[in-house]
Amino acid sequence: MKKTIKLAVVAALALGATSAFATNGSVMVGTGAKALGMAGTGIGMSHGSESALVNPALITSIENSEISFGGTFFMPDVSFDNGMGAGPADSDADLSVVPMVAVATKISENVYIGVGMWGTAGMGTDYRDSAANFAMVTNLQLMQFGVPVAYKVAGFSAAITPLLQYGSLDINFNPGTGNVGSGVAQDLEFGYSIGLSYEISAFTVGAVYKSQIDMDYKDQLSTAGAAFGLTLGNELSTPAELGLGVSYAFGANTVALDYKQIKWTDAKGYKDFKWDDQDVISLGYEYATKSWAARLGYNYASSPISDQGIANTAINTMNLLGFPAIVESHYALGGTYNFSEQTSFDVAYVYSPEAEETYIASNYPNQGTRETTTKHSQSALSVAVNFNF
């Protein structure tokens, strides 16, 4: 059964190698075109069936049934300067595509159910043509399947979503002494999310908890770490998240504010790389008419990685060269056009301005240390088609 599911997910991911998302750390800023158009905001504001991906309690806003499917084109721009005088090298991991499908239906006066598949996280670089950067290629991909079940009474909704997560990780490089790497490793594990929402007058408040999911990628981190003199396990957990959100609707306008914490310090693997917890703030605005809607948003979280100093130069190298999660600000705009009462089209664009970090890093054991610099910016274009029936 696991092999069958893995094959299905690999087929979906074949649309594009997901090597870098518009991200807080390695977690997507948002999932779905409506949420992305508001920079990920959606814990306290319903986006229809798409809410299954953000706060499953809010799928109770649909009238009958709704299906949304689409995808996001991610275009990261990453470079690394190893401090040896040759100048920066650009990562070739500059385009990826992730599909998204979300379905929700009202099955009784109080009970709603859905199903969805969506990419949730990813990060990586591709320096295979840069020997000075060890020809390093890293690629983390995560995708989830979920079945949200929600119950609504009066203005209160509660939901739980059992999750099945597929993950793949590939780390390979050549430090000049031969290839290091074990090919792509995959895993399939379970988790869950819990959502709550309450509507009172023009306000909606929401809360969501997403469980940590422990993933094990055979021989990936241990093999890569050993080459840098590090002793690492092969677990790389998807971190737990806790979020709160509120929205206020007045006329055609809605303003929404979300806060969530991403628990990197408790996540296996990320603890070894010294990642810090992130406090994420998202602010979104929507103007909606019967035929169209426009959205704006801003998302901010400080980088989870930091300079670990001269005692941890190998960790600095792995973070900056392989997993440069340094982007902090995200600006978004989006919209919806309603072709009819049954059919609509969503679009969103997210831009993350360039961030730059310089750490003391090690090229390889016994080769000394030097200052290395990574620059990273991101842009993403998301589209979706929605059907109500």
Regions found by a protein language model. Give the residues of each.
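Short hydrophobic "helix-edge" motifs at membrane interfaces and signal-peptide entry regions
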Residues: 44-47, 331
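Gram-negative bacterial Sec-dependent N-terminal signal peptides
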Residues: 1-22
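Outer-membrane beta-barrel pore proteins
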Residues: 43-45, 52-65, 103-107
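Transmembrane beta-strand segments of Gram-negative outer membrane beta-barrel proteins
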Residues: 27-42, 60-77
